[in-house]
Amino acid sequence: MLRFPKSPGPLLAASFVLMAAPSVSQAQSDSVLYRAAVLRIDAPGPMPISRLSLPAEDAGFAGATLGTADNATTGAFMKQSFETETKALAPEALAPEMERLLGEGVQWFVILGDSAAVSQAADLAGDRAVIFNALSTDDALRAEGCRANLLHIAPSDAMLSDALAQYLVWKRWSDWFLIEGSHPQDRALGAAYRRAAEKFGARLTAEKVFEDTGGARRTDSGHVQAQAQRPVFTQGAANQHGVVAADHAGVFADWLPYHTWDARPVAGSAGLRPVTWHPAHEAGGAMQWQARVEKLSGRQATEAYFQVWTAL
C-alpha cells in the first residue's frame, strides 16, 4: 500500500520550484531551455550466465533519446526546448561528473544505478537538483533512505513482490518454496516476498539459502556442474505449487527453470518475473512506443528504456 503525506511538504514544494526555474535564463523570445542528464553507473558484478543477457553499451539511453524527442514535440508549441546528456560512469566518477553538470545548470538527473549510487547522487545534488531513480528497487530508498529531492520511477521490491504474490494466489499457486541468495540484497528481496506472502494469503512451505561460493559457472565444466547441482539442491522440499527465487545478485535463479527436482513453475528473479515493461504490452500506445524504440536502437525495449523515458 502506498502512503502519502497529509500535505505536500518540502518534497513537492522543492520540486515545483525547480520545475519553474529552467536551467538557463529566458531569452527575449521567451524560449526556454531545459537540461537534464541520464547517468548510468556501472558497478562491478558477476558476468551474466548467458551472453544474451549482456547489457548493451548504451543500455537505457534509447529511452532518454525518445523521451527528449517527445518533450520537444509538445515543447515546440510552448516555446520550450530540451537537451539531455547521457553518460555511463564507473562509481568513482559519479561525484565529479555530477559536480560538472550541476555547475553547468543541470537540474534534473535520471540515475540508472544501485541504491548506493542513487543515494550518493541525491546527497550530492542537495537542493540544487531533483534526482529520478530509474533502476534501483531497494525498499530502503523508500524508507530510512528517503531524500526530499528523490523521486522514484522504478518500483520497489515491495511493489514487485506484491504484484507477483497477487498473481500466484489468483492462480491458486499459494504454497511456495522460497530460495534466496546469500547477498544482502537477496535477503532483502526474500523479506519482501515473505511480507507479500503473509499479506495475500500464501504459505512458505519450504525455505532455503543458496550460498554464493563463486566458481567457474561460465566454463564448460562449471556449466555441467551447475546443471547437475540444481535439481539436487531443490530435492526434498515440502510439497509446493512453485519455486520463488530471490536473487538480486544474479547468481543462481537463471538455472532454476526446468532444473528443479519436482516439476514446478519458477517465479521471482527468473521464470515468471514481475516487470514494468514487456514486449507483450499492447494497450495505451505500447506497440507504437516499442516500434519507435526498436527503430531508434535496433533492439527490443527493456525496463530501463521504459523507466528512463517515463522519468523524462
Mark where each language-model region is:
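Bacterial N-terminal signal peptides that target proteins for export
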Residues: 2-12
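Short beta-strand elements in bilobed, periplasmic/extracellular small-molecule ligand-binding domains
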Residues: 73-91, 147-149, 198-220
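Extracellular/periplasmic ligand-binding modules, especially the Venus flytrap/periplasmic-binding
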Residues: 64, 281-312
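Extracellular/periplasmic bilobed ligand-binding domains
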Residues: 123-131, 175, 184-288
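Short, well-structured alpha-helical segments in soluble
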Residues: 88-107, 167, 220-238
